């Protein structure tokens, strides 16, 4: 390429490249912005994110932050747009004083990966400070004998700004005696002064009032003024004069107290007192000078009396004056400039920031642990700092910028070998002798969450009495975690599920920290016998690990339900049962039967009946079955018996305390021929004592015929079924119908039942016993939910038969508790022993029953396990401490054999589908028994 005028383009390009390279080397790794001082909050400084090459979307995820070592609140970054803006007032004079350069150094730190950028924000000076004189008024005493061009120094004004804003110009108010002498730029040390241009005449002008104004170079201009009061003196014409107007001295900053700085000398041409000189600091000297230096008034020697610090002030300007003893006194002035020389007297300072502790043991080499910055207040070589780390540790220091280091992981960690490291970082400067400082870093190796909380056993069983107070503490679960710190911090919670129509959390609460299990509301054994749920234990690790434990809460029964009387049969009014009894009946005739139920279980539902005594000394020919509730005659009735009897039957359970109910039975004795008549009058409402009798002849005849017919059909059907049954067991046969039994735990519904005949070698069997398996809570291995009680009361055929008529015990059966339940053996009977009453239940063991009666027997019983479909060989009433026994009556007893235990549970309204044909057969037989019972009544 040919250029005109012989210009070489290659040299131009080379020069441009050198300039660009030098600029790049000077500013590598930094951004530079500028902002004027006193900028308002929110003023734009620069697009720092864009200039650093960072995307706005990664500022928050990478934890973008700005760190300032001294004043961190002056500038902020908007993480939404990446703009650096002014956050608070910036005062350049407060921040940097009179330094020519003033900048704020920022450290921009981002993580993932960790990066550090350095940004310098230059603070531009504005003209916000006016010139200020040391005093608002200055008094000058000038002898009238002073010659022309005499110079009188003045203390100039000071301006806190810099540059052109601090360039001051002075002007003096118009006068004929003085003009203002302003030093040039190369005479900055020379003070401002007044120059006499006309001889003074005290007699003509004894005083002068002048105004000195200082104006800075800023825009707009700011000014400051001082009043000059000049007093013209007579006689003493010569003032002291120093050898030099400026003395310069250099002192090390560690100079000792009492060291002589300089001995300035002044002379006075006058004689006598007018020539005697007294040295002192000028009146406008700063307090800082007075605290560091002392001047002898006679010799003028200046000595050190305070500590000197190069880092605080690098030079001290001392104004000195020499005053003679004339009247008025005259003064001469000079300036002593003390330059402070730096020495290595400051140890390095270490600062740790952004600690990433503790560090997981699976951290990768190169992971940054912390950022370390070092700073030394000394200058030059004394301020150059190098850092080192404790040897033989899996960490190292990496220099990221001048005086900035990163502590990073050098190799893999093993928490099982070393769980923590104590590191020492040493910073050493380049002075002589060298100074150093250390900082300790405790690096803890964190465990990873690899162990789930574990319970001591997979499930627990808890027993709680019903009617517990709300908020009752029933159990405490505890799980251990082999991890450390938060990975071993276990919290507990309830595994929510539905319990019927309600949430499990409405019943149970688990304390998250202690694992205490609380029952939130009173429990009812009649509604809920077993509550099975799970408690979850979860640690605080990331990700969290957990495990569950199963709690089985059995609700124990309490005697909180009184016996409830069943509704009387038709014909009773006013809550009383009315019965007509012919006088011709004999002993043992059943007059009526009181029926009651109890919603509790076990002994709390075991009911007994007794007659309340009437008038004192009176006897009645009636008795009530202790456990059947049947009212029967104790002897044959005769004419001496009263025609009407009011019987009060007390029904009570065996709970603690016992609860009772009372039934009223009105018995009227009538002649066989008078019964229809009395009943007729009663039905017509005729007045008289027989008006309350009911005419039942017609109904009685119809009932007898119907019952007789049903009885014959039932017997025929029963005989046919017995003959057709398999005879594999000899005289004993098995039938498996589905029945409902009223027992000490209420009305039970069972899917399997076995009727087993008690066989004797001496003769045919005398009694049958209906035996059932109660619906007890299953063991821990069971997965079935507890059965809820059914509020619908309906009685099966077998239950109605037990209520309305006698049940002849022809077969004996054995009941067993659920799997895992306590073994209690049904009492045995001696068929050769006569008993006073048929079908009565003996009291608990130890109540005084003779040795020939049925008694309780405890022991392991027959160890043989029942197979599927077979009848269990043991029986227990839940909630009872012992088994009740039924005593067999003698065959020749005249008392009706219809006594039967009346338990109080409600029957479930919905039954399972009938599984076998024998179930239907058993129901038919129960209907036949019910019909027979009705005929007996």
From Swiss-Prot:
Pfam families: Cadherin (PF00028), Cadherin_2 (PF08266), Cadherin_tail (PF15974). One of its GO terms (cellular component) is plasma membrane. InterPro entries: Cadherin-like_dom (IPR002126), Cadherin-like_sf (IPR015919), Cadherin_CBD (IPR031904), Cadherin_CS (IPR020894), Cadherin_N (IPR013164), Protocadherin/Cadherin-CA (IPR050174). The chain crosses the membrane at residues 698-718. Residues 774-881 are annotated as: 5 X 4 AA repeats of P-X-X-P. SMART domains: CA. CDD domains: Cadherin_repeat. PXXP repeats lie at residues 774-777, 786-789, 819-822, 860-863, 878-881. Residues 30-133, 134-242, 243-350, 351-455, 456-565, 581-678 form the Cadherin domain. Glycans are attached at residues 254, 265, 548. Cadherin 1 to cadherin 4 domains mediate homophilic trans-interaction, the interaction with an identical protocadherin expressed by a neighboring cell. This is a head-to-tail interaction, the cadherin 1 domain interacting with the cadherin 4 domain and the cadherin 2 domain interacting the cadherin 3 domain of the other protocadherin. The cadherin 6 domain mediates promiscuous interactions with protocadherins on the same cell membrane. Each cadherin domain binds three calcium ions. Calcium-dependent cell-adhesion protein involved in cells self-recognition and non-self discrimination. Thereby, it is involved in the establishment and maintenance of specific neuronal connections in the brain. This is Protocadherin alpha-7.
